C-alpha cells in the first residue's frame, strides 16, 4: 500500500545521500530555532547580516505560507478525480505533496502558528491517504483502514473545539478531505453496510468533526455547502440512517445559521429530509431537538422551505403535539415555536391546513406563561401571523379570558421583542374586521369551487370595483361583530353536488336584517319572527319572492326557493301552535284563576320602578335574555349582532333612520305563550364570553350556523304585563308610527321611557312582588339575633291605613313576619279598594324604610294601623344594662297581675267594671299623648284569643323607644310569672338605658305590687284593651290603662348619666328590702314635660292607686299642684282602706337627689291639708320618688 511508507515515519519528508558523516535522515529543527539547517559556517561578523535577512524573510513568508499550502492542496482535484482509480504514481505524488507542505510549515516565522500547523498536519495527511484508498473501491476494507481513520478522526474532533485549531485545519484542507471521505465512504460501502457499527461510527465522527470545524467559519461553511455531492450525501444519510440523523442535523444547523443566498439554495434539499426525520423521531426528545433546530434555521430562508415543512405529512401535527409548557422540554419547545413563527407567515397567506389552525392556536396560548423568553416571543409571533387575516381565530382568542389577561400582562414586559410581539397581537384583536364580503368564502374553505358557481351579478359583488367594496369602511363594523356573515355562496361541498340552485340571500356584514330595500344590485334579507301572524307571513313570503326574482335569473329557481320557504314557515307555525295548545291545556288544569287587575294599579309606582323586583331577571343582569325569551323588540337582536344600522356604503346612507326600519306589528305574547317559552328556555341564553345557542333565523335558509356571533341581547321584564293592559285583559299592540321609531330597536332601561319597559303590579303577581319587596326591605334593615326585627305600637292603629274590621289573629303572624298583609285563602273576590290601599301601603313602606330613625307605617292588624320603629344601629348593651331590664321585669310581676289577666281572659266583666274601663279609655283618648285614637272595644273572648296568639321572646329590644313596644310581645302567662316570683326585686327601678332620649317616663299609674281585689277589677293588659303601650321596661306595669306618655321634647342629652345619689336621712327612714343581687341603677336622660294641663286627669285620680313620678323635669305651678294633690288623696285613700290579699305595704314618698333637676317655678301650696308635709320642701336638687 502506498500509504504504508508515510505511516511508518510521518515526519520524514525526503532522504539525502550527499551528506557526509550523517545517517541520511533529515530531522526537523528544534521548535523556535531561527537558524537554517546548513553545513556552511558563518563568521561572527556575518551575524548582523543574517538577522536582517531573517527579518525580511519572516515578513514575506507570513503571508505566503497559507497561500502556498492552499495552492498545493488545490492540485489534488478531489471532486474531479473522484471516479478515477489512483495508481502508484499518484500515491508517490501525494507523498511528495505532504513533504512540500511540511517544508512550508517549517518556514513559518510564527512559532505558535507553526506548532499548530505541525500538530494538525499528520491527521490531515492520513485523511487524504484514505481518500486515495477509497477511490480504489475495495470490496472489503482492511483492518488498518478503520483503525487509522478512526484514530485520526478522534484527534480532529478532540482538537476542533479550539478556535485556532479550526483555523489551521481549514488551511490544511481538512474540511474538503473529510467531505470527500464521507462521500466515498457512503458510495463505496453504502448505507446498509456489512459492518454497520464501524462505518456508522466513522460517519458519526466525520459529522461531529465537520460540525466543529464549520463553527464560526463562514469560509468553511461556504466551501462545504458548495462541495459537489456533499449535501446529497447528507440527505441520504438523514433519510436512510435514522441512528445518526441527530449529528447530521446538527451539521445542517451550523451550515444554515446566517447563511447567504447561495448557501440557502444549496441547503434547500435538506428541509424535506429533516421534516421526515422529525416526524419519525418525534417520540425521542433528544433525537428530535437537533432536527427541529435545523428546521428552525431553514424555515427562515425561503417561502419554499416553509411550504415544504407544511406539506410534509403530519409535520404540523407533530409540531403542535410538541408544544408543552413543561420546563423540561424548553429547548424542544423553543425550536418548535420558532418553526411555527416562520411557517405561520406562509399559512397567513394561504387557505391550506385550516383544520390545524385552531389546534395550533389553542396549544400556543398555553405557552404564554412559559419561563423561556424565546418561547414566548416565538409564540406571540406565530399567533400574530395566524390571526391577522382570520377572524375565526381572533374570536377564539377573545373568548379565552386567561389568554387575554396574559396578553395584557406581557404588555409590560421589560424585553422589547416581547412588547413588540404583544402589540402586534393586541392590535389585531382590537381592530374591526378588515375583510370584505367575499373574503370569508375563501378563508373558510370555499376556494374555487364556490367561485365557479357564481353568476354574473354575483361575481360583480365579489369584485373590488363594486360600489360597496370601493367605499365601504371596516370601521362601520363594531368590535364585537368580528365574525362576518359567510354569505349565501358558501355551502358544504356535498350539498353543492346535490343542490345546484343557489340559496336565498342572507344578511350582509353591514346592514340590519330587516332592511329589505334593493341597494346596488343586491337585496338584504329581513328578520324572521316565529310569532308573526298569517298575514305577516304571507307578506314576508311575497317580499322573499320579489327578492328571488331580482337575484336569480330563472323562474324555476325562484319557484323552488319560494316553495322551500313556504314549507319552512308552515312547519314552524304548526310546531308553535301545537306547543301553544299543549301549554294552554296544562295551564287550564293546574293554574288558579287569576283575579282581575285594578285599573288604578296599571301605573307603576316609583317603588316598583326603582326596585324592579317584579321580575326574576333584571335589565342590568349579566344574563340578559334573548329573542327566544319573548323580549318584545322590533328587531331580532340575537341575530342582528350589533351592526343594526350600518349602511351599505357612504353613498347609500339613508336620509332618515326610518328608511332602515321596515318592521311589522309584532303581536305580544299571551300569558300561556310566555309560560310555555319561559318554562322551556329559561337558561338558554349564554354570556357574551361563550356562544349563544339562540339560533339565527333569516328570511332564507341559513346554510352556515351563526351561533358564534356575540350579539347584544336583553332580558325580559315581566313579559305578561310588559305593555299596558286593557280592561278586558288583552294586550294592545303598538301602532306602526311607534314601531317606526329607531329608538324601538334596542329599548334602554330609562325610567322616563314608556310604561311598557316596566311591569305592572296586579292580581296574584302583586302578592309575589310584595313579598319580594318586603324581603328586600327587611334584608337591608339591621337585625339582631336576640331581638325581633320590628316592634309595633298599638297606638298607631288606623294611621295611613283603610278602615277594616278587627280580626282575632294578626294578619301577618307568619314566621317571616312580613309587614305586607296576606290575602285570605277563602276570599275569592278581592276588594279593589283594599288592593289600592295595599299598593299605597306598599309605597309608604318602601319610602319609610329608607328614612332612618323615623316611624314606618305598617299594617299591623287587619282592622288597625300602627307604626313600625326601625331598629337603629347601636352597639350591644352591657351586662349591667341587661340586668337592669331583667330586674325591672321581675319587680313588676306580682300575683295580682296574674289574677287580673285571668279575670280578663276567663270571665265577663260586670257593668260597673265595664263602665270604669270605658271612662279610663276616654280619658286616655282625650289626652294629647294618645293621638286621639278610637278603637273598637273587643269582647273578652276576642281579647283572650288575641292574647293567646301573641308570643315573643323574653328579652326586651332596648334599641327601640319604649313607647313603640307592643305589650303583645310579652308573655303574661301564669307559668311565666312563676319563674320570677322568687327573684322579686323591690328595689328595681323603672329606668332603662334603652329608653329613647326624647321620651319622658310618666309612671303615675304604676302598680304598688299588692294583690288587692280592686286592682283585679280595674286592671287589664293593653293587649286586651288595645291601650297605648308606655315607655316602661319589659315586664313592668306598663299594661295598666292609666299609664300615659309624655310629649317628646328635643334634648341634648347624649351621654350616660351616673346613678343619682339619694338623701341619706330619707333612706334611713324608709329602708329598702335587701335582695340577693343588687345592681346599680341608671337614670334616664333628662327631658322636659310639656307645659299643658290635662283636665281629663281629674276624672281618673280616684281610680288609680299608683304614685306619679316626674323625673328630671321642671314643672309649672299648675302641674306641681296637681302632683301634690294626687299624692295626698292617694295617701288618704290608702290609709282608710285596709290592705287586701297578701297585705302589701303602704306606699311612702321620699325625696332623692336627681341628676339634672331644676328648681320648680313656685314656692308655696294652697291646700291646707298638706300642712303635715310642710317640712318637706322641694329642693332644687331633689326629686319626688315613691317607694313601694
Swiss-Prot record:
ARM repeats lie at residues 314-358. Residues 1-50, 579-624, 670-702, 726-751, 778-952, 1003-1092, 1157-1181 are annotated as: Disordered. Residues 604-624, 677-701, 778-788, 800-811, 909-929, 937-946, 1014-1039, 1164-1180 have a biased composition (Polar residues). Residues 600-1188 are annotated as: Required for interaction with pry-1. Keywords: Cell cycle, Cell division, Cell junction, Cytoplasm, Developmental protein, Nucleus, Protein transport, Transport, Wnt signaling pathway. Residues 832-843, 871-900 have a biased composition (Basic and acidic residues). One of its GO terms (cellular component) is cell cortex. One of its GO terms (biological process) is negative regulation of canonical Wnt signaling pathway. Disruption phenotype: Worms exhibit lack of endoderm, excessive pharyngeal tissue and premature division of the E daughter blastomeres during embryogenesis. Two-thirds arrest during embryogenesis and the remaining third during the L1 stage. RNAi-mediated knockdown causes partial nuclear re-localization of hmp-2 in the embryonic epidermis and the production of supernumerary gut nuclei probably resulting from epithelial cell hyperproliferation. GO terms for molecular function: beta-catenin binding; gamma-catenin binding; microtubule binding. During the L1 stage, expressed in vulval precursor cells (P3-8.p), seam cells and excretory cells. SUPFAM superfamilies: ARM repeat. InterPro entries: Apc_fam, ARM-like, ARM-type_fold. Gene3D superfamilies: Leucine-rich Repeat Variant. It is found in: Cell junction, Adherens junction; Cytoplasm; Nucleus. Interacts (via N-terminus) with bar-1 and hmp-2; the interaction with hmp-2 is relatively weak. Interacts (via C-terminus) with pry-1 (via N-terminus). Probably associates with bar-1, gsk-3, pry-1 in a complex. Belongs to the adenomatous polyposis coli (APC) family. This is Adenomatous polyposis coli protein-related protein 1. It comes from Caenorhabditis elegans.
